[in-house]
């Protein structure tokens, strides 16, 4: 059997970080993922997919991602159910993220033209920010792509993105 999900989208709200009674970090967030086709009005629709990430990755997601951040998620679909306050059974489908990739330079959402030399959400404490945060050190770490500069920095043209282009 195979249960594998790969998503790329933007967060619709800031991640919500909690801790279990045993002290294990868990973060919830929702990704807006564009559908590959347009509806009858010519508009692109989006799916809003709930994601859950655990442990150190959850803390990293809460610290470095926010509403509007572009992220990649690799994981599996999981369903659960519970009885709500009215006694009705509620079914929930969510992606249990095994890996979360930060797909934009840190601070690009709020600082416009920040000069960041590292794609993937890296920081001085975590130079391989775009890699799987759940891997133990000493594992097979991959270098992030070889990007050294913002490809749009010397273009001289403003990037024109309207609110209609955003999936949230």
Curated annotation (Swiss-Prot):
The lineage of its organism: Bacteria, Bacillati, Bacillota, Bacilli, Bacillales. Residues 103-168 are annotated as: Disordered. InterPro entries: NA-bd_OB-fold (IPR012340), Primosome_PriB/ssb (IPR000424), ssDNA-bd (IPR011344). One of its GO terms (molecular function) is single-stranded DNA binding. Keywords: DNA damage, DNA recombination, DNA repair, DNA replication, DNA-binding. This is Single-stranded DNA-binding protein. PROSITE patterns: SSB. One of its GO terms (biological process) is DNA replication. CDD domains: SSB_OBF (cd04496). It comes from Halalkalibacterium halodurans (strain ATCC BAA-125 / DSM 18197 / FERM 7344 / JCM 9153 / C-125). GO terms for cellular component: nucleoid. A motif (Important for interaction with partner proteins) lies at residues 163-168. Residues 1-104 form the SSB domain. Plays an important role in DNA replication, recombination and repair. Binds to ssDNA and to an array of partner proteins to recruit them to their sites of action during DNA metabolism. Homotetramer. Residues 107-117 have a biased composition (Polar residues).
